[in-house]
């Protein structure tokens, strides 16, 4: 499994005119981002992917949020979960992960806390991603979120398509209808879990538990399949 082509597309994108969209892996705002912020987010993402090893479960959300992946570099994950106080961090947080924002308190995303709580905080085998893997913001500015327009999602499905080709055999679950529709456009039928935001936490937890308890067809990936190792992650 080689995610280098996926990361190259991710770091380069998005395609087309995309006003109100930040690619946090190559862009930074001086008033919001700390030193070498974009590089730090790339490094955070690649370190996380190494911890995933071989994905067996993929949770696909909509887009990066400003309290989460916009500054952490990882979907459904906040700075505080990576680089905050030890009691607030995920079990796999700490070094080499780092915060990239100028927020002294570090950003914390409620949805990310719910998702990782439902996953038991375990990164191994669990890949979190977004169908639009950058940060679209609204009229209130860069510290806001918006749903990416359908045309914008469609124009950038090549990133998701390449990712899915590399992780064939994993169970794919959509978090919300936008993610489900994007998967359907690629010919992938996936159940839509209730998004944990806006009161959906309990339903999300129950649906995730129910779906992961169901047997799935044997993966085509053999026990010798390459994991997401450092050599397979470099975006050249």
What spans do the regions from the language model cover?
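A polyanion-binding, active-site-adjacent surface
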Residues: 2-171, 179-186, 191
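Short, flexible loop segments at boundaries between secondary-structure elements
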Residues: 188-217
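Intrinsically disordered, low-complexity terminal tails and inter-domain linkers enriched
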Residues: 218-235
